[in-house]
Curated annotation (Swiss-Prot):
Monomer. Interacts with KCND2. Interacts in a calcium-independent manner with PI4KB, but only if myristoylated. This binding competes with CALN2/CABP7 binding to PI4KB. Interacts in a calcium-dependent manner with PICK1 (via AH domain). Interacts with ARF1, ARF3, ARF5 and ARF6. Interacts with IL1RAPL1. Interacts with RIC8A; interaction is favored in the absence of Ca(2+) and myristoylation of NCS1 is not required. Changing D109A: Loss of magnesium-binding. Keywords: Calcium, Cell membrane, Cytoplasm, Golgi apparatus, Lipoprotein, Membrane, Metal-binding, Myristate, Repeat, Synapse. It is found in: Golgi apparatus; Postsynaptic density; Cytoplasm, Perinuclear region; Cytoplasm. Ca(2+) 2 binds at D109, D111, D113, Y115, E120. Residues 36-47 are annotated as: Ancestral calcium site 1. The gene is Ncs1. One of its GO terms (molecular function) is calcium-dependent protein kinase inhibitor activity. This is Neuronal calcium sensor 1. PANTHER family: CALCIUM BINDING PROTEINS, NEURONAL CALCIUM SENSOR 1.
Length: 190
C-alpha cells in the first residue's frame, strides 16, 4: 500500500471509500495523518498503546488498548495497516448500531470462538476500569469489574449457560440505554 507515500493510489482510495462510511477526501485526510504518525505505514501494539495513554492519562489503558489493537489487526500480523485502521474507525465512528455491536462482540470474544464467556467479559471490564482509573464515580452495584459483569450476565445471558452469543449480546445491549450510549460516543466526531 505504498508504505511511506503521502498519497494513496486512486484505486485504493476508491476501494476504501466503498468499504467504509468515509468520502474519498476523508480517506485521504486520514491517510495523511496516519502516515505522519506512522511513517512506516504500520502501527504496532506499543504505538497503539501510546495513543491510548494520551487519551487516558489518569488510568492505565495498556490492557484495553491491547484488546482493541487485536480487533483492529484483522489479518493478525501484529501490525495495523491503514486499510485495517480506516475500516475499524469507520465501523466504530459511523457504523450502524448492529455493526458497532458486532465489532464490540469481537472485542469481548477474546478467543474468537463465537461466545463471550464470563471470564472474557471480566478481562475486558477489568481493563476498562484500569483505563479510566479513579476518574469515573461508579454506583455501588457496579464499583468492581466483578459486580459489573454479574449485572451484565444477569441481564443478557437469557439461557443461563454462562456465555453470551452474538444475538444475546446484541439484544441485551439494545435493551440497556447506557450500552447504546457508550457505543454512540464516537458518532459525529469524525
Amino acid at each position: 500500500m505504498g508504505k511511506s507515500n503521502s498519497k494513496l493510489k486512486p484505486e485504493v482510495v476508491e476501494e476504501l471509500t466503498r468499504k467504509t462510511y468515509f468520502t474519498e477526501k476523508e480517506v485521504q485526510q486520514w491517510y495523511k495523518g496516519f502516515i505522519k504518525d506512522c511513517p512506516s505505514g504500520q502501527l504496532d501494539a506499543a504505538g497503539f498503546q501510546k495513543i491510548y495513554k494520551q487519551f487516558f492519562p489518569f488510568g492505565d489503558p495498556t490492557k484495553f488498548a491491547t484488546f482493541v489493537f487485536n480487533v483492529f489487526d484483522e489479518n493478525k500480523d501484529g501490525r495495523i495497516e491503514f486499510s485495517e485502521f480506516i475500516q475499524a474507525l469507520s465501523v466504530t465512528s459511523r457504523g450502524t448500531l448492529d455493526e458497532k455491536l458486532r465489532w464490540a462482540f469481537k472485542l469481548y470474544d477474546l478467543d474468537n470462538d463465537g461466545y463471550i464467556t464470563r471470564n472474557e467479559m471480566l478481562d475486558i471490564v477489568d481493563a476498562i476500569y484500569q483505563m479510566v482509573g479513579n476518574t469515573v464515580e461508579l454506583p455501588e452495584e457496579e464499583n468492581t469489574p466483578e459486580k459489573r459483569v454479574d449485572r451484565i450476565f444477569a441481564m443478557m445471558d437469557k439461557n443461563a449457560d454462562g456465555k453470551l452469543t452474538l444475538q444475546e449480546f446484541q439484544e441485551g445491549s439494545k435493551a440497556d440505554p447506557s450500552i447504546v450510549q457508550a457505543l454512540s460516543l464516537y458518532d459525529g466526531l469524525v
